[in-house]
Amino acid sequence: MKIGIVVGRFIPLHIGHVNLIQRASGLVDKVYVVVSYSDEGDTEMISNSRFIKEITAKDRLRFVKQTFKNQNNISSFLFDESNCPPFPEGWEKWSSLLKAEMEKREPNLDWENDVLFISNRKNDEKYNLKFFGSKTKSIDPEYLEYPVNSWEIRENPSKYWEYLPREVREHLIPIITICGGESSGKSIMIDKLANVFNTSSAWEYGREYVFEKLGGDEDSLQYSDYEKIVFGHQSNVLYAARNANKFALIDTDYITTLAFCLTYEKRDNPIIREF
C-alpha cells in the first residue's frame, strides 16, 4: 500500500493546502496529514497576525478533519516539533520524531518504497530523500494555481477571505452585534446593512421563539425558556458566521437576554453567562 504524507502548520488552512491534500489523495492509497506545531513558534506567529481570534493546534487539526471528513483515505494527526532546532539544522531530529509517530500508525513502514511525501515547499525533495529515503511529489511550488500563502493571509485575512475553507471562516469571522431597546428598528437595520455589504445576518432569536413556542406573546415566558433562547440564538449566529462575507451582523447579544432574565425572573442564569 502506498502511503502519502503531507506536512504543514496550516496557520491557517487555505484552499492551496486543500488542493495539495486533495491531489495527494489521488496519488496514493492513504494520505496522512501531519499538523505540526511548536508552542513558542506558533504563539509568536499568531500574535503577529491580524486574526481577531487565536488558532490553537487543535483548531487546526479540526479544520483539516472537518474539511476531509467524508474521505476515508485521508487521516490527520498533531505532531509536536517544539523541541526541534530550526530548519535546516533540525531536519535530523525532526525526521526521527516523525518516523516514530508514523510507525505507530503504520508499523514496519518501508520508507523507500511505500512512502511518498507530497509538498509545495522547495528543498523538501532533497531533505526527504536524505533523512527518510523517500521520494517527494512537488505540487504547485510556485503558487500558480492558488496565488496565496499562509503568511499573506495572516497579514490581511479579509483580503484573502475567498481562499479560506468554510471551517476556517467560521472560526475567524468578525462578529458585529447591534444592541438596543425592543422594537427600535434593529432587525431592519441589520437586514439593510447585510444587503449593502453582501454578507449574512442573524436576527434576534427571542422574538422567533416567542412566536413559535409561546403563541406569539410573552405572557407564558418563564425561567427555563431563556436557556432555549440563547441556544437558538447561538445556532443562528454560527450559521451566519459560516456563510458570512468577511464579517457577520448580529441582532442582539446574550447580555440582553441575561438582562431580561434578571429583570423578569429576578434570578441569575449561569448558562447564559457562559455565552
Spans of model-derived segments:
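Short, structured active-site "lid" loops
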Residues: R50-N70, D219-K246
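ATP-dependent NMP and nucleoside kinases share a basic, alpha-helical "lid"
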Residues: R105-P107, Y127-F131, D253-F275
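Hydrophobic positions on the alpha1 helix immediately C-terminal to the Walker A/P-loop
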Residues: M189, L193
